[in-house]
A protein has these predicted regions:
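Extended active-site neighborhood of metal-dependent phosphoesterases/phosphodiesterases
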Residues: 39-47, 110-229, 265-276, 301, ...
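Extracytoplasmic/periplasmic, Sec-exported soluble proteins
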Residues: 72, 76-79, 83, 114, ...
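His/acidic metal-ligating clusters that form di-metal
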Residues: 86-98, 194-196, 208-325
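Short active-site segment of divalent metal-dependent hydrolases/proteases
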Residues: 67, 106-107, 141, 250, ...
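N-terminal active-site segment of His-dependent metallophosphoesterases
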Residues: 9-113
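Residue-level marker for buried hydrophobic side chains located in beta-strands
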Residues: 59-61, 99-101, 135, 244, ...
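A short C-terminal boundary segment appended to hydrolase-like catalytic domains
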Residues: 16, 21-24, 28-34, 39-44, ...
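Active-site glycine-centered loops adjacent to acidic/histidine catalytic or metal-binding residues
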Residues: 64, 103-104, 138-139, 247, ...
Length: 389
């Protein structure tokens, strides 16, 4: 109680601040805990490194850190910030190709100047690390949870706040490719491997009387322009092993869209690519989420999309739909078993502060020689699972 009281008192900000100076000053005092960085390094050295070769692509992956300006010892809070600091610190001395975050950096429930401060500090940590990085947008990252809880009638984040604090820095790196300045699809290459990043929070920022038409926290989707860009990238993907990452799951086990808009269409693109088809793809919608596009995947050689990897659900699960593995990773954010919103998966882990179950993270090794995608978990995560590519 004392810790929480001091934290709430500390994070009091002036309304005029774009980023809370007090938040920024406090966050800069956070340091990686040696026990955790050593633990992450040991997991890599023992389990991952024996599988690393010159042709592999090796990723350090976190998702759903839900950073929040409270020093909670049992739920979302500053622990999410620490997990990123510690994972990136460990990877500075490891043969990792990229540091990846699958979205929901923040919980989105703090005052906007505090949430912006959390985003800025976290991205500076990624920028100062020794590895290139990519951070995807999650459905909490536009701070709509704060708007909902405070019943305010105006959007707490402006149109370009998230882009300027996060996405812009993704694309400042030469390793991260995109088709055009406005494209929401990114990709990285290494040898015969191509990794594509999709934005499952591709929601138009439209204000009605100062309030958002769409609540980014509740609405997930992919719009026509992003689908067109994905098609363009795939049409030029020749003889590659392709793995796709996003924040939210695209489809259910039954094949129905798990997004509010167009998750099933993206799955159809994947299967059409694997089948080397050409044709037209459209839905029954008009307006913001209407889609009517053409594609031609007949000249892509032996390229195949094998796996789609995401977070969002705060548990682990994998299922195969039409030959493509859909893999859901657990949240890094601490979820103590006594909290009502804690998922059953995390309750079983009985996650505790200052124990290895506090965090959850992954190393993903894509090996074209063995034709395997191997996932090595640590903390509250499955230790090993592998899939064909």
């Amino acid at each position: 109680m004392k810790i929480k009281f001091l934290t709430k008192k500390f994070f009091r900000a002036r309304l005029s601040e774009f980023i809370s100076v007090q938040t920024d000053n406090f966050l800069r005092k956070l340091k990686p805990r040696p026990f955790f960085t050593e633990y992450i390094e040991q997991v890599f050295r023992k389990n991952v490194e024996p599988n690393v070769s010159q042709n592999c692509l090796t990723l350090s992956v976190l998702t759903d850190t839900h950073e929040k300006a409270v020093a909670s010892s049992s739920y979302y809070g500053l622990n999410g910030v620490r997990h990123i600091i510690e994972a990136n610190k460990a990877c500075d001395s490891l043969p990792v190709d990229y540091n990846i975050h699958l979205g929901d950096l923040i919980d989105g429930s703090d005052k906007p100047e505090i949430s912006r401060g959390l985003l800025q500090f976290t991205m500076e940590n990624y920028q100062n690390s020794q590895r290139p990085f990519y951070v995807l947008e999650g459905n909490h990252d536009e701070n709509d949870k704060y708007d909902e809880h405070k019943f305010i009638t105006s959007a707490s984040f402006r149109r370009d706040d998230y882009y300027n604090l996060v996405t812009k820095h993704d694309f400042e790196q030469p390793e991260i490719k995109r088709l055009s300045l406005g494209s929401k699809v990114a990709w990285i290459d290494k040898g015969d491997i191509r990794v594509i990043f999709l934005n499952t929070s591709d929601i138009p920022y439209i204000l009605n009387g100062g309030a958002k038409k769409y609540d980014f926290k509740k609405v997930r989707g992919i719009r026509e322009q992003q689908i067109e860009d994905l098609i363009s990238i795939l049409e030029k993907t020749i003889d590659k092993h392709v793995v796709v990452f996003g924040h939210a799951n695209l489809i259910s086990q039954s094949g129905r869209s798990a997004l509010d808009f167009n998750g099933d269409l993206v799955q159809k693109i994947f299967t059409s690519f694997n089948n080397k088809d050409s044709g037209q793809l459209k839905n029954e919608l008009s307006g913001d989420f209407g889609v009517n596009v053409r594609y031609n995947f007949t000249d892509t050689g032996i390229s195949t999309i094998s796996n789609y990897i995401c977070g969002h659900m705060h548990y682990e699960k994998c299922y195969k739909v039409n030959g493509i593995n859909h893999i859901i990773l657990n949240c890094s954010a601490l979820m103590g078993k006594k909290h009502g919103l804690t998922t059953d998966y995390n309750k079983k882990w009985d996650r505790r502060y200052n124990e290895i179950s506090e965090l959850a993270g992954y190393f993903i090794n894509i090996n074209p020689d063995k034709m395997l995608l191997q996932i090595f978990g640590y903390g509250a995560a499955t230790r090993f699972v592998s899939f064909e590519i």
